[in-house]
């Protein structure tokens, strides 16, 4: 009770206008954080795509005549993973963004079957760095807030190593 009385004496009375102003500050800061996290996800996907030296970025799905990216992001929607654009991602329970970075693998753009391999990624911010976490902590690194493509090269190599390791599991014994 004493703390509340002291606060009221020091700060006068807090009005609904004060609460609205603070709420606007919170919403603005969350929007800025979300934009930064999404930019990391976009750059990570693009850097992975570039590092794969793909003969082409897309393949044509004969069932739908739709062009499909070889490298893309998946996010959980209604309990299942669906292809999503990073701008559609929302915060997870710890104010980060979680998604799967997926690669479709085939012999040629017109060949089937195609295999999709995905690596779970979580990006959040701690102070002056972004933290990139792969496979719930199997690999973690940080990059500066002002990042460039080279900051993602090690992460992309680890993602490719995870995919190769997962593909090994498909070889019959």
What are these regions (language model features)?
Residues 2-71:
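Charge-rich, low-complexity N-terminal segments
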Residues 23-26, 30, 81-83, 87, ...:
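Generic, low-specificity signal for short hydrophobic/alpha-helical stretches with a mild N-terminal bias
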């Amino acid at each position: 009770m004493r703390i509340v009385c002291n606060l009221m004496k020091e700060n006068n009375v807090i009005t609904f206008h004060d609460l609205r102003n603070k709420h606007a500050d919170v919403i603005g800061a969350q929007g800025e954080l979300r934009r930064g996290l999404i930019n990391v996800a976009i750059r990570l996907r693009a850097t992975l795509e570039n590092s794969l030296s793909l003969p082409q970025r897309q393949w044509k799905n004969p069932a739908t005549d739709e062009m499909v990216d070889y490298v893309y992001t998946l996010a959980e929607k209604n309990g299942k993973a669906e292809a999503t654009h990073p701008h559609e991602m929302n915060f997870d329970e710890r104010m980060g963004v979680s998604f799967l970075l997926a690669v479709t693998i085939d012999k040629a753009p017109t060949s089937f079957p195609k295999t999709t391999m995905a690596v779970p990624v979580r990006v959040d911010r701690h102070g002056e760095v972004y933290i990139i976490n792969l496979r719930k902590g199997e690999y973690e690194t940080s990059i500066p807030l002002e990042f460039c493509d080279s900051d993602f090269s090690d992460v992309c190599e680890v993602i490719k190593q995870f995919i190769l390791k997962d593909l090994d599991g498909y070889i019959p014994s």
